[in-house]
Amino acid sequence: VNLSRRHILVLLPTAAIAWKFVEAGTPETAPNYNMSSHWWGMLIDIPKCIGCGNCVRACQAENDVPDGFFRTWVERYHVTDTDMTNPEVISPDGGKEGFPAAAEDAGKYFFVPKLCNQCADSPCTQVCPVGATFVSPDGVVLVDQKYCLGCAYCVQACPYGCRYIHPEKKVADKCTLCYHRITKGLTTACCESCPTGARQLVDLKNPSDPIHAFLKTHSVHVLKPQMATGAKVYYNELDGSVR
């Protein structure tokens, strides 16, 4: 998309209006939902993930994700004793239908679900020329597709590879932590479908949230901490080879 300076200046006020609308609450939120009382994130408990693909399928069904694109996906890592820093990583069709049988050889296998990291200091929001993507007051990175130009600047800026341009709508799309669900007191589709509890939604502003306590008592990590994005997807027992 070719964006002239005049085009951007014309669109910026409408994007600001969109932000005020979202800040006040959207039709997707429950009437009594208070954005400022929450700060959403997620825990991925790697030892519990069995690579079944339930989360990927549930996400695609819940959010009408087009074939070949993913708001969340699962990777399988194979770390061998001979090369512990360069694992084999596969994710056939996003792990949607599971994985082939592991080879009977040395090393270890484990699964790593990935999704938007809901960064508090998100690179994607900083490069959007019209403010169509933003961090909501409750900590979820959203895209107002009415104002998105489809320029893909945000797709290129995301260090986690979590965005794509919708092939039909021609606008940016990504995981929203099932915003239409969590603002009504429900959990995300991926968390609800996980048979082992490997994925857990967490309200970081709620000290009584059991996952909040887990984060304080376990050595959890975020992906690519050197990027200093304020990522809020936390991984328990994250192997150093994960990239």
Can you name each region flagged by the protein language model?
Residues 12, 16-20, 56, 63, ...:
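A generic secondary-structure signal for well-formed alpha-helical elements
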Residues 1-16:
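N-terminal secretory signal peptides and thylakoid transit peptides that target proteins
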Residues 42-58, 62, 108-131, 140-161, ...:
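Cysteine-centered iron-sulfur cluster-binding motifs in ferredoxin-type domains/subunits
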Residues 25-32, 61-107, 134-147, 162-180, ...:
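Non-heme iron-sulfur electron-transfer modules
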Residues 189-243:
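Long, compositionally biased charged/polar accessory segments in the mid-to-C-terminal portions
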Residues 19-54, 226-228, 234-235, 243:
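C-terminal segment of N-terminal export signals and the immediately downstream linker at the start
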